[in-house]
Amino acid sequence: MNKATIPIFYAIDDGYAKFVAVSIKSLIMNANNNYNYDINVIYENLSEENAQKLKSLETDNVKIILTEMNQNLSMITDKLGNRLREYTFTLTIFFRLFIPVMFPKYDKCIYVDADTVISDDISRLYNEDLGDNYLGCIVDKSTIDNEILASYFEEVVGIPRDKYINSGVL
């Protein structure tokens, strides 16, 4: 019997390699053996040593796929106005936006931030019915209760405080 494959995505640079390794390991520890997992790591400036360490995490039902972010990177680096607080964020925060274009073979996937620990079987999240929605996410509660953040998102970013989402797991 062929197992269904669940595609999982991460976006990193070399500085986040050790964090994504922990996240992937936690995913593997809680993985459902009735599924295969394609863990796609989209990266910029990943050392060969760290790439090998990530590949070494593969198991019988977990495949690690490393994809360098190259031609798509010019879309976000050519315009200085596209950068949000670059002292806080790296360009990798934008990589998740390219997943549908770069990986059209997947009808559905999960994106996970590199610093996220998976404490349960992620197939349960994957199997949630999204209805007619394109995206499964939650409202970022920190923006609702924090007036400074809420004002920033409403006035600068143009998103109402009750519509700003947490993009760490999509």
Predicted regions and their residues:
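Glycosyltransferase catalytic domains, chiefly GT-A lineage
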Residues: M1-L170
